[in-house]
Design a protein with these regions (language model features):
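C-terminal "post-core" interaction segments
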Residues: 1-257
Length: 257
């Protein structure tokens, strides 16, 4: 399990380190990538992360103008496809936007072609996929931000939600809804588990007080989407029977950005 909270300069390197650690310490036979409430970030990092799951040299994302003319394209590189040998589940929700939608949508597009073993689970993403440029007005006292292009996924789907649109973002292969109270409780547990007490020198200290346990998301039924994802992975790899949801099989990794 890897949770990405954003896309910054070091995201792909931290992701690679997390995967390497999992392969070294465990028999890694499936991966959950959590992009829920990920607001996005750097496009090149989204392309780099998506490339980890996509073999070959196919397109990952394109930009198109209002008339649908392709202006630019980012393609996969075979040498960067490092996680193509295991089933993958990507979690998204209405808080997944921009770069996270590009990752989820690109992986989904190739999975639907049968090129990779992956599904997207959760709720429809936010729908933010526009390219904007800033133009300064005469005198440099004011500026105008103008949308010039939109992002397109490999299957031609437009990410951005336009006024009155009924189709946008990334639609999960498997929709699993959660109540607002469940979302809040799960988010609070994750946030509190990620906070580490430090002393005045910036060193992590043990206060002796019990810390929130991320495994409670599963064992206490707080995160239905994560629970479904784990059951699906277990069903694909000689794991416990469906319906039996054990504690997380390995330490989760959060890449904070």
């Amino acid at each position: 399990y890897v949770r990405l909270t954003g896309f910054v300069d070091t995201t792909d390197r931290e992701f690679d380190a997390a995967i390497e650690q999992m392969r070294r310490r465990h028999d890694l036979n499936g991966l959950i990538v959590d992009l829920r409430f990920n607001p996005g970030g750097l496009l090149n990092q989204a392309v780099s992360i998506a490339n980890r799951f996509i073999p070959g040299r196919g397109p990952i994302v394109q930009t198109a103008d209002a008339q649908g003319r392709i202006a630019s394209q980012e393609r996969a590189s075979e040498r960067r496809a490092s996680v193509t040998d295991i089933p993958v589940i990507i979690l998204v929700n209405e808080g997944s936007a921009s770069a996270s939608e590009i990752v989820a949508g690109a992986v989904q597009a190739y999975a639907q072609q049968g090129a990779i073993d992956a599904i997207v689970l959760g709720q429809r993403s936010f729908g933010k996929g526009s390219v904007q440029n800033v133009y300064y007005l005469p005198g440099q006292q004011a500026a105008m931000r103008l949308t010039t292009h939109y992002y397109l996924l490999p299957n031609g789907r437009r990410v951005h939600r336009l006024p009155g649109a009924t189709d946008w973002g990334v639609e999960p292969d498997l929709t699993v809804e959660m109540l607002p109270s469940q979302i809040q409780e799960a988010a609070n547990l994750r946030r509190n588990a990620d906070v580490l007490p430090i002393n005045e020198r910036g060193e992590i200290v043990d206060t002796g007080e019990p810390r929130p346990d991320p495994n409670d998301l599963l064992s206490n039924g707080l995160d239905l989407q994560l629970q479904y994802a784990l059951v699906l992975l277990q069903s694909r790899s000689e794991a416990p029977a469906l319906g039996q949801v054990p504690r997380a099989p390995m330490e989760p990794v959060t890449i904070e950005n």
